């Protein structure tokens, strides 16, 4: 997926679990543009993971084996915590 195709990335952010939508969509909407190109590529790789894995990682019930994905999960958690709750 092209890092500049925001419509497609936005669609990929929509998940089958509400809990994931609450974590991933605000991060994409508020933070994606400020990421480096490398971070954008890692975020897209994260979106290619299965929902159960994403849920476990974002809810701190495990962590990805891939160090880059782990850093992205922590970045999402940190930025969402700093921003506070947002309506989606």
Swiss-Prot record:
Signal peptide positions on this chain: none
Family according to the record: Belongs to the SdhE FAD assembly factor family.
Function: An FAD assembly protein, which accelerates covalent attachment of the cofactor into other proteins. Plays an essential role in the assembly of succinate dehydrogenase (SDH, respiratory complex II), an enzyme complex that is a component of both the tricarboxylic acid cycle and the electron transport chain, and which couples the oxidation of succinate to fumarate with the reduction of ubiquinone (coenzyme Q) to ubiquinol. Required for flavinylation (covalent attachment of FAD) of the flavoprotein subunit SdhA of SDH and other flavinylated proteins as well.
Predominant location category: cytoplasm
Subunit structure comment from the entry: Monomer.
Origin species: Shigella flexneri
Entry's Gene Ontology BP terms: succinate metabolic process
Any single GO CC term annotated in Swiss-Prot or TrEMBL for this entry: cytoplasm
Protein origin, superkingdom: Bacteria
Chain's gene name: sdhE
Cellular localisation: Cytoplasm
Keyword terms, alphabetized: Chaperone, Cytoplasm
Keyword Chaperone on entry: yes
Any one Pfam family match given in the protein's UniProt record, by short name: Sdh5
Protein name: FAD assembly factor SdhE
